[in-house]
Every structure is written in C-alpha cells, then in structure tokens.
C-alpha cells in the first residue's frame, strides 16, 4: 500500500473525449455502445490509468439500485499488433564478460508507444520495479523485409529512453511473425511473434558503481484470434 507508484491514477481529461454527452438506448434493449475517443500522446504508459464511468440519475429511466452496478472503472490499456505478454524464458541475462549462470525472467510485457512501437524494461527489471522508468527501451517494428500470406520477417530498431544506462545493441535485432490455423478448432488462428536481440546495459540503481549486463536470446508471444468475429479487439482471446 506504500508503493504509490503502483497505484492506479485518474486518466487526465486531455487524454480522452466523449463523442456524445449521452448514450441513447432504444426501448427493449439491454446494452448499447458508448464511444470514447482516447488520446495517448504525452501519456506515461509506465503508469496504470483508469477512467471512472457512472450512470447518472434521470427521470426518463430507472437505474439499477444494486451497489456498484451504476459505476465502472475502465482500465485504459491500449494495444497494437505487437503489444502483450511475451515469454522471456529464452532470453538470458549475463554479467558482462560472462557466459555462465544466466539470469532469466518468465515473462516480459510489451506496452504500446505508437502503432508500430512497443516498450518494455531491460534485463530483469519487472513492470512493478520502483526504478522501472529508468530502464525503459522502445522497440520499433520496421517494415517487413520478407512477407508472404502467412509470415513476415523484418528488423527491429531498439533505443533506450535514458542514456544513463549505457544501452547498446549488439548485432542486428529482428522479428518474425507467422500464422497457423488450429487443427482442432478451424476458426481459431494462432499468431506467433518472435523477437531476437542481443544488447548490453548498465544497472545504475544499486550502487555508485554501475553493474554491466548483457542480454541475449528471444521473446515469444502467441495471440489466439477467433476469425469468426469481425471486430479485431473482440476477436483476440486475451
């Protein structure tokens, strides 16, 4: 409870807009869409944001009196084609100058920056690390070099937001994305993302003397997509 950096924060007014002041529900209907336009420019997505929504009293309808049924806390979590949870068990983190006894984390969450870019945290830094913003790196998916109907490969451009960590790319980072249909459920598409990279960085938090690390390996994400559902955000089985 003392870690205020992990608290959900109220989404600033400049980052959203209601396209209409009211939501019209025809008689006999139980649900209706209420469009909200989000603006993520300048929003720090290292933090967790919520937008409270309340159904207000009005003489033209009867609201549900059950406690909590008129209020929702909308967790604002943008996504793009590359964001999500990646398995990081094939990404080894070594002390600089060593190839033995690597450190490994189970997962790495990629957050949205823009349509073709995500960010995550280097090495063993977790999403709830108190110093996580110091170790943020942006990963941009460049245009595919090779592309077929079911597969594409290309290069990654990776940059650190904080020069103090002395982030350096080693070699040429790449991505590979391919689709496979499920053998038992023919409507279900499996989309796999593999990111291959090697980089070095300094941990500047623990002491006055930085500790250097080298990370090498790959990250893997699988998305399951129901091809029978036309809306992309609804088709993904999160």
Predicted segments with their positions:
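Intrinsically disordered, low-complexity regulatory regions in eukaryotic proteins
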Residues: 2-24, 33-50, 56-238
